[in-house]
């Protein structure tokens, strides 16, 4: 099936995948006077006295902005804000379908970090949360950090944290399958961009101790020449044995491989050199670092990819709709590690001990339990960690 051609035809037919639907009927002079002037002045004045009332008297409580500069759209690269619109509209559809969250695309015509931060911060009063999307590394880290400092609503870069949450959920169950613990295993990652770094940070928050990151030049370690500031930071908290060399060198004896890099990065020889019953998360899309049958032929116990046509898909739609649903429900000021970890645990728990096996470590995207399970866990973690406001 030619999905590209079909998508072109359907997008031309749809003329946009989202639209505004009015909740207030304006079918009489009286109704008009309530929804607009003169009646609308009363809620305006209430919000003026207490801006928090904007959550009760407008749709702000359920709205999220999906913000991009179009610099890292899917695998297409820097295609610009207008070309990124179909993806952002699609993201908004997923927010609504899987989380009942009203999301709106904001595609900005600048690559300047401070301009993006200023633009989004000025618009923050209209939204209950901000989802950053398809912004290239390392700028995405700075943009997220600065927005978190100046905004009092959740700022969430899904390419980083959504991927990290699903990876953690899948890894928790994969480790159960092979009978290993996160604090005991050695993990080697390929890809030191937004997703790769966020995955490692969240896994370390869960107790991971032994992890080696690799990029195109090989292992990342403290003192390696040519590291950007973000990789320098990661070098200080990972690879404590200062392992050097290529991916093939450092993966020997590793228990887990996590790839968010490029097709074909992991070879069968590398899998063969890993510890017994290795776990392989090959998440490059659409072509993984290694195909499941190739990895299993060399002894891989559990294999996960980013594709829906293989078992154990790492799919962000399992995370961001429910996580934002929970954050919005308690009017959270942030989405923190506690909420991410709680969401991952909730996802992992949807796979029962009886169901858990090498071919089934994560619930399916269309599992109707996902939204409520993640939302409830995220909301509770927000309350316990002090970022909930209701």
Model-found features: residue ranges?
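N-terminal ligand-binding/catalytic initiation module
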Residues: 1-155, 375, 380-381, 385-389
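Solvent-exposed alpha-helices and their adjacent loops that cap or buttress functional pockets
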Residues: 12, 55-60, 96-97, 122-124, ...
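General beta-strand structural signal in soluble alpha/beta enzymes
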Residues: 105, 131-134, 155-158, 189, ...
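Adenosine-phosphate binding glycine-rich loop
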Residues: 158, 178, 282-390
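Short, ordered loop/turn segments at secondary-structure junctions
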Residues: 69-71, 79, 108-109, 134-137, ...
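Rossmann-like adenosine-cofactor binding region
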Residues: 232-301, 307-309
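Glycine-rich phosphate/diphosphate-binding loop of Rossmann-like nucleotide-binding domains
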Residues: 74, 79-99, 157, 161, ...
């Amino acid at each position: 099936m030619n999905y590209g051609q079909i998508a072109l035809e359907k997008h031309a037919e749809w003329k946009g995948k989202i639209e505004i639907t009015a909740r207030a009927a304006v079918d009489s002079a009286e109704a008009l006077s309530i929804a607009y002037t003169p009646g609308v002045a009363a809620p305006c004045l209430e919000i003026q006295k207490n801006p928090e009332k904007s959550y009760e008297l407008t749709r702000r409580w359920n709205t999220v902005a999906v913000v991009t500069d179009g610099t890292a759209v899917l695998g297409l690269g820097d295609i610009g804000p207008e070309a990124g619109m179909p993806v952002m509209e699609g993201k908004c559809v997923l927010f609504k379908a899987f989380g009942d969250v009203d999301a709106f695309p904001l595609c900005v015509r600048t690559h300047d970090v401070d301009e993006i931060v200023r633009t989004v911060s000025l618009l923050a009063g209209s939204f209950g949360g901000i989802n950053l999307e398809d912004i290239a590394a390392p700028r995405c880290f700075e943009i997220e950090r600065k927005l978190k400092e100046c905004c009092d609503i959740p700022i969430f870069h899904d390419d980083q944290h959504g991927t990290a949450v699903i990876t953690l959920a899948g890894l928790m169950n994969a480790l159960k399958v092979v009978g290993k613990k996160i604090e005991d295993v050695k993990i080697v990652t390929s890809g030191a961009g937004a997703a790769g770094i966020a995955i490692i940070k969240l896994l370390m928050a869960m107790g991971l101790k032994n992890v080696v990151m690799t990029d195109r030049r090989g292992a990342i370690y403290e003192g390696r020449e040519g590291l950007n500031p973000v990789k320098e930071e990661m070098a200080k908290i990972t690879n404590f044995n200062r392992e050097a060399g290529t991916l093939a060198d450092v993966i020997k004896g590793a228990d887990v491989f996590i790839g968010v890099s490029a097709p074909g990065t992991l070879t069968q020889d590398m899998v063969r050199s890993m510890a017994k019953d290795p776990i392989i998360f090959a998440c490059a899309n659409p072509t993984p670092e290694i195909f499941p049958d190739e990895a299993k032929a060399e002894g891989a116990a559990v294999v996960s990819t980013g594709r829906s046509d293989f078992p154990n898909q790492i799919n962000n739609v399992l995370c961001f709709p429910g996580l934002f649903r929970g954050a919005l429900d308690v009017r959270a000021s942030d989405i923190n590690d506690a909420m991410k970890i709680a969401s991952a645990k909730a996802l992992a728990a949807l796979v029962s001990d009886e169901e858990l096996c090498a071919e089934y470590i994560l619930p399916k995207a269309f599992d109707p339990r996902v939204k409520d399970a993640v939302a409830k866990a995220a909301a509770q973690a927000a309350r316990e960690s002090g970022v909930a406001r209701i």
